[in-house]
């Protein structure tokens, strides 16, 4: 990643990324991308972490949210995603994060990705969980 490209990443924020490769870790570190880890948010408090995010995004005109369902705890919800990893967020926590960001009035899009019903050992539970999140925030 070149220095000129890192300016575009200053407002990129991750929540709950838990399964990365060393190359990804290097980019996250070198570009100073904040990853709010699940245990960090639970320890520090969701409100505190979300307020930090809102402060960081004050100069941003538009916010685009990608909700990758593998941020959800696969043991609590489902393995119906490309990268099922335990110790993730529960549905209520994801809703809290998205609603907090929505409170800015700057969210222009919400993308939901990584649902894979072929890997879902609970029927179509991961898709149902995604719909629960969407239903709760709109």
Predicted regions and their residues:
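Conserved alpha-helical scaffold segments that buttress catalytic/binding sites
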Residues: 1-138
